[in-house]
Amino acid sequence: MKLPGQEELEAACACENVPVGQLDSGPSSGPCPDDPSDTGSRELGPPEDPPLFLQLNELLGWPQTLEWREMGRWVLFEEKLEVDAGRWSAPHVPTLALPSLQNLRSLLAEGLVLLDCPAQNLLELVEQVTRVESLSPELRGQLQALLLQRPQHHTQTTGSRPCWGPAQSRKAAHNKEAPMQQQCQSPLRQKLPPGAEAGAVLAGELGFLAQPLAAFVRLRDPVWLGPLTEVPLPSRFFCLLLGPPMLGKGYHELGRAAAVLLSDPHFQWSVRRASNLHDLLTALDAFLEEVTVLPPGRWDPTARIPPPRCLPSRHKRPPLHLQKVKGLSVPHRTQAEDRHRNGPLAPSPELQRTGRLFGGLVQDVRRKASWYPSDFSDALHPQCVSAVLYIYLATVTNAITFGGLLGDATDGAQGVLESLLGTAVAGAAFCLMAGQPLTVLSSTGPVLVFERLLFAFCRDYSLDYLPFRLWVGIWVAVFCLALVATEASVLVRYFTRFTEEGFCALISLIFIYDAVGKMLNLAHAYPIQRPGSLAYGCLCQFPGPGGNESQWTRPRPQSRDDLLSVDLGLVNASLLPPHECVQQGGYPRGPGCHTVPDIAFFSLLLFLTSFLFAIALKHMKTSRFFPSVVRKVLSDFSSILAILLGCGLDALLGLAMPKLMVPREFKPTLPGRGWLVPPFGANPWWLSVAAALPALLLSILIFMDQQITAVILNRVEYRLRKGAGFHLDLFCVALLMLLTSVLGLPWYVSATVLSLAHMDSLRRESRACAPGEPHSFLGIREQRLTGLAVFTLTGVSIFLAPVLKFIPMPVLYGIFLYMGVAALSSIQFMKRVQLMLMPAKHQPDLLLLRHVPLSRVHLFTAIQLACLGLLWIIKSTPAAIIFPLMLLGLVGVRKALEWVFSPQELLWLDELMPEEERNVPEKGLEPGHSFSGSDSEDSELMYQPKAPEINISVN
C-alpha cells in the first residue's frame, strides 16, 4: 500500500534517476569525493549516530479547516517560519521556556511511548499511536484521517518568491498538490550528509479531544513516511502532542521543546539506546540539569541568538546521563589532556630516533613511497588551478624581486635570470623528491643577508666570489647530510610555538618592509612634483655652431616669442614641451623633463587597491553576500582577481607605470662566465678548507629556516594524512645546495609565507553543513602537481616576457603586502600584542585569559617582542653574520622561560617541550573536570590552544 503522494514522489525522483531506495542516503550525488569522512567532522552527535533532521508540523485552523503546516525545522540550529514574510528565519540557537520542558516531561510520563516500533509506513504508525483507551472508535477514525493529511511545507529556493505571504491568496498559499520534484531537489537536502535521518514532531490544538494526547515513537528501522517532512529522508522518531484548546502558544512551545530535545546530540544518543520510559525520562532529566536559565527582565525572550563561531566540545558536557543509561560512563579527562585533545603528547613517528645511520631518511622514503601515486591523482581538482595561478605569480614576483636585490648585493654576479632559473630547477626537483611537496622553495631574507655579507667579504679581500661561494655550498651540503645521517631533525620537537611565532613574525615583517620599501623607492624614482618647486621645471637648450648652447640655430626668428627665445637660449618646458624641443633640435634639461607627476599617486592607488581588494575577496567566503558557490570562487581566486583588477586599472589609466621586467635572453647575468662555476678561479686552494667556517653558520641558518617552516606546515591541526618528511626534506635541500652552488644559482630553502599560502590555497572544507553551521575544515589537498606546475611555469616565464610585461609592479607589491599582513595577523602572538593595547573590560573572552593571569600573558608577549626586535636589529646591522646563531638562540630563550613561568602557564601560552610533557601527569598540574559556567570553553576557534594559529589566509 502506498501512501498519498508517494507515487508522485517516486515519479519525481525517477526524473532525477534517484532510486527511492536510496533516499536514506541523502543527496543523490553521494558523499563528497574529496574526503570520505566529510561528515565525520560534524558536531551533530557521536560518530556512530547519523545526523537528524527535525521538523515541527503544527495543526492550525481549528475549528474551521484543519491543516498541518510546517512551522520550524532543526538540523543543528533552529529555523522558524516567518509566516507574514513568507520565508525561513536565519538559523539561531533555540531558546525554550522552562515550563514547556516540564510540561513535556509530564505528558511523556503519562502518554504513549513506543520504542523499536515495527511500523513500515505512515498508516501503520498512525494506527499504533491512536490505539489509546481514551479515544472512541469514531474519534480514533477522525484522528487517523487528520494525521494522514499531507502537511503544507514551506519550500523556497534561492531567488524565488515565497510560497505564501500576506498578499497572496489562501488557495495559492496552500497548494495541496505541490510538485514532489521540488521536494527531491530541496536545497536543504543538499546540505545533509549521506545517512541522515528525519524526525517529525506534530503538535496543535484539537477541539474534540477532552484531554491531552502525547505519543513518542522510536522506529526500529528508519522508514520513509511519505511527505511528512519536507526533505525525503527515512524517519527514525515521531512525536505527537495534541490536546484541547488552551491559552497562549502552549502546544507550539511543547512541540518546539520536543524538537529541541531531539536536536541535542546527547539526548539523541540516549534516546537511541533507551529501552523503556524510565531511560527516556532519565535522559530528559539530564538535559534539564544542563539547562541554563536566564532571569526575566535581563534578556529579551524574542531575541535570537546567532550561531557561535565554534561549538563547545562534546566531552566538556557532564556525562551524567551517559552514566545512567545502561550503566555507561565516560572516561575522566583533565584540562591538560583536553589542551592536547587534537594531537597526542607523544612525538610523531617522523620525530623518533631509529638509532641507525640515515634511519630517519629511510623511514621517510618508505612512508612517502606508498603515497607517491596519489600525490598526482589527488591534484585533479579545479581548486588546484587557482592554487597554481596564485602561487605562480607570487613565486615569479618573489624570484624577480630577490633576483634584483641579489644582483645589487653581488654587483651582477647573480641576477634575475639566475633567480628564475634556480627557482624553477630547485623547486621542481624538490616537489618531485621531497617528503612535504607543499613546501615552496625560494630565496629568503636571512639567506639574502648571508649572501650580501659573503660577497662583501670576498670584495674586501680580493677573492673570486663565485668559486669561494661554491666551496661554501659544498660544505653546507656536507654538514646537512651529516645532520640527516645523525637524525638531527628530531630536535625540531624543541621548536615550540614561541620559536615558530618569532620566526614567522620576522619573515612576515620582512615581506611588509620590502613591499613598503619598494613603493617608497618607486616614489623616489617618480617624485611627486609640486608647482613652483625646482624639480618641477624643464629647460630646453639649443646648441650653437661653436658649442654655445645659448644660440638659436634654426632660421631667423619671425615673432616676439622667437626673439625672446634667442635672447634666453633656454625655453621653459611649459612653452616648449620636451618632445617639441627635440623636434626643434634642442635638448630637454632638468629633473622634470621625463617625469610624469601622476605615476607616484596612481602607483599608490594600484598598490592599495590590490591589497584591499585581495583582503575583501578573501573574506567574501564568510560574508552574507552572494550564494556560497560564488563566494567560494571569489575567495579562492582572490589574489588572481586582485591582480587582474590592477592590470585593468592600469590599462584604463594609460600611464607609463613600472611593469614587471623579465629577462629576454637566456644567458648568465655576469658577462664572460659560463653556467658551471670553476672550483678555484683566482683563489688559493686552502680557501676550499677555510670555507667550512662560514658554511657552518649557513648550515645552522638553513637547518633552522627549513625545519621551522616544516614544523609549521606539519602541525597536527592541518590534518595532513600523508605525514611529514623532515629528514627527506633536509636531504633534498642539501643536494640542491650542491647543485645551485655548482651552477652559480641562488641558494634556496623553504619560504614560510609562500609555503603557508600554498597550503591555504589547497584547504578542503565540507560541502554538507547544517544551516548556520560554518563549513568544517577537512584538511589540505596534499599532492605534488601544483608545486611542480608552479615551478615549471616559473622556468617558462623567461619566454613569457610579452605577457608578463603588462603586470604593474605596484600591484605585485600590494600582493606582497597582503601576504605579509595576512601571515602576521594570523599568529596568536599578534593577538596577544593587541591585548596589551586593550583595557581589561574590552578584552575578548579567551581561553588563554581564563587560565593565565593577564600580567603573565603580557610578560610572555613582551619577551617575544624583545626577541623579535633583537632579531631585526641583528639582521639589519653588520653583525648579521651571527643571525643564524640568534635563531638557534630562540630555542634557548624558550628553555629559559621554564624558570620564569610555571608549566601550566606555558601549557596555555606556548607548548610544552618533550621533558615537560613527560612531567605533566606527575606534577598533577590540572584540576579535575569542572563544569561551572566559567569553564564553558566557548571562545573563538582562533584561540583554541591547538587550533591552526599560524594559518595564512592568502588565496
From Swiss-Prot:
Which reaction is this enzyme known to catalyze? 2 hydrogencarbonate(out) + chloride(in) + Na(+)(out) = 2 hydrogencarbonate(in) + chloride(out) + Na(+)(in); K(+)(in) + 2 hydrogencarbonate(in) + chloride(out) = K(+)(out) + 2 hydrogencarbonate(out) + chloride(in); Li(+)(in) + 2 hydrogencarbonate(in) + chloride(out) = Li(+)(out) + 2 hydrogencarbonate(out) + chloride(in); Rb(+)(in) + 2 hydrogencarbonate(in) + chloride(out) = Rb(+)(out) + 2 hydrogencarbonate(out) + chloride(in)
A Gene Ontology biological process term: sodium ion transmembrane transport
Give its localization.
Answer: Lateral cell membrane; Apical cell membrane; Basolateral cell membrane
Q: Which tissues is this protein detected in according to the database?
A: Highly expressed in kidney. Expressed in the outer medulla and the inner medulla in the kidney cortex. Only expressed in beta-intercalated cells.
Q: Which residues cross the membrane?
A: 387-407, 415-435, 472-492, 503-523, 596-616, 637-657, 684-704, 730-750, 785-804, 811-830, 871-891
Pfam families according to UniProt = Band_3_cyto, HCO3_cotransp
Region (Disordered): which ranges? 20-50, 154-190, 331-352, 918-955
Q: Does the keyword Transmembrane apply?
A: yes
The Gene Ontology CC terms held by the record are: apical plasma membrane; basolateral plasma membrane; lateral plasma membrane
Q: Give the sugar-modified residues.
A: 548, 572, 951
Q: List the InterPro entries.
A: Band3_cytoplasmic_dom, HCO3_transpt-like_TM_dom, HCO3_transpt_euk, Na/HCO3_transpt, PTrfase/Anion_transptr
The UniProt GO MF terms for this protein read: chloride:bicarbonate antiporter activity; sodium:bicarbonate symporter activity
Which residue intervals make up region (Membrane (anion exchange))?
387-955
Q: How does it sit in the membrane?
A: Multi-pass membrane protein
Which of UniProt's keywords are assigned here? Anion exchange, Antiport, Cell membrane, Glycoprotein, Ion transport, Membrane, Transmembrane, Transmembrane helix, Transport
Purpose of the protein:
Electroneutral Cl(-)/HCO3(-) antiporter that favors chloride ion entry and efflux of hydrogencarbonate and sodium ion across the basolateral membrane and may participat in salivary secretion. Also mediates Cl(-)/HCO3(-) exchange activity in the presence of K(+) as well as Cs(+), Li(+), and Rb(+). Does not contribute to Cl(-)/HCO3(-) exchanger in the apical membrane of the upper villous epithelium.
Q: Which family does it belong to?
A: Belongs to the anion exchanger (TC 2.A.31) family.
The protein, known as? Anion exchange protein 4
Species whose genome carries this gene: Oryctolagus cuniculus (Rabbit)
Lineage, highest ranks first: Eukaryota, Metazoa, Chordata, Craniata, Vertebrata
